[in-house]
A protein has these predicted regions:
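Selective detector of the "anchor" transmembrane alpha-helix that sits immediately C-terminal
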Residues: 194-200
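Basic-flanked hydrophobic alpha-helices used for secretion and membrane insertion
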Residues: 4-194
Length: 200
């Protein structure tokens, strides 16, 4: 049932978060067109987007990440040596769609008529979500990013030297646990109500 799922989320928050803080920037440049940087030693650039895996039954969102070489947060040794369209996928993604190494997986843009083909080079078992990982350089090539463009930072400590105005969202482990707690709370009372209804 639902509360079990929430317990699962709570115990797997680190499986949904690669670092204690995830900062997504509004843009990689500030208002003066200067590249946004941080002095924080924990901070690591990353890219992310969401693509859709289409099937007859439903279109499912897949998180796509560009990960820094020798990342401290997503430890996939071979990532930087992969070819442009080669990727690692989360084991949950592989299991759900029966994908194995060497398979080609096709994903689409949600709102544009654009499709990408990726070749599965390996699996990453530390992520609970349906996700796909590539090196940050390959991500830039695949999605045709501008030279210094990136999505944000992963960090295990709070980043204090980036102007709030430049940050689109900050996600912390605390947020995810809190979200699960709130859901648990609202679902909990809803479930009791539902059980009473069933008895009537």
């Amino acid at each position: 049932g639902m509360p079990d799922t929430l317990d699962y989320y709570k115990s797997n928050t680190d499986g949904m978060m690669f670092a204690k803080y995830q900062y997504v920037l509004k843009s990689y440049e500030d208002d003066d067109n200067k590249l946004i940087t941080t002095e924080n030693k924990d901070a690591e650039k990353f890219d992310m987007t969401s693509l859709v895996k289409k099937s007859d039954v439903l279109d499912e969102e897949i998180s796509v990440y560009g990960i820094a070489d020798n990342s401290n947060y997503v430890k996939i040794k071979k990532l930087s040596s992969l070819k442009k369209n080669e990727v690692y996928i989360s084991t949950s993604f592989a299991d759900k769609y029966g994908l194995t190494v060497g398979d080609t997986v096709s994903l689409d843009e949600k709102y544009e008529n654009k499709s990408y083909k990726f070749k599965v080079a390996g699996f990453y078992d530390k992520s609970q979500s349906l996700a796909l990982f590539m090196s940050i350089d390959n991500y830039g090539k695949v999605f045709e990013l501008k030279e210094n463009e990136f999505s944000g930072f992963l960090s295990d400590s709070k980043i204090t030297d980036i102007d709030e105005d430049n940050i689109a969202t900050t996600i912390t482990i605390h947020d995810i646990t809190k979200m699960a707690d709130q859901l648990d709370h609202s679902m909990g009372s809803y479930m009791t109500y539902f059980q009473v209804l069933c008895i009537l």
